[in-house]
């Protein structure tokens, strides 16, 4: 049985300052009646457009474990939303999520 509430995986960063990233995507998509399941790619002190000496905590090493857990739970998503990727390897994690976690 499918979840009656649309569910998406949101693969994106979390910026501490600035109206960007998961801080914006989660409330907007939630107001649209969508269950947002974040897979954070990085935590930044600010967004990267206006600021240059921001801090960045790359979460690439965590993404595989997140996906392993989601797959063990049998989670499926109606869509995958992606944003800022902190490393090229994160594209592989996004592709894996699309391949293995999209609802049939």
Task: Outline where the language-model segments fall.
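Ribokinase/PfkB-type carbohydrate-kinase core domain
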Residues: 2-18, 24-104
């Amino acid at each position: 049985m499918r979840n009656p509430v649309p569910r998406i995986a949101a693969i994106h960063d979390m910026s501490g300052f600035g109206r960007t990233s998961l801080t914006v995507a989660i409330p907007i998509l939630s107001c649209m009646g969508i269950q947002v399941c974040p897979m954070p790619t990085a935590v930044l002190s600010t967004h990267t457009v206006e600021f240059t000496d921001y801090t960045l905590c790359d979460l690439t090493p965590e993404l595989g474990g997140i996906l392993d857990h989601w797959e063990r739970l049998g989670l499926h998503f109606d869509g995958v939303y992606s944003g800022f990727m902190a490393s090229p390897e994160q594209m592989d994690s996004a592709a894996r999520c699309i391949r293995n976690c999209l609802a049939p």
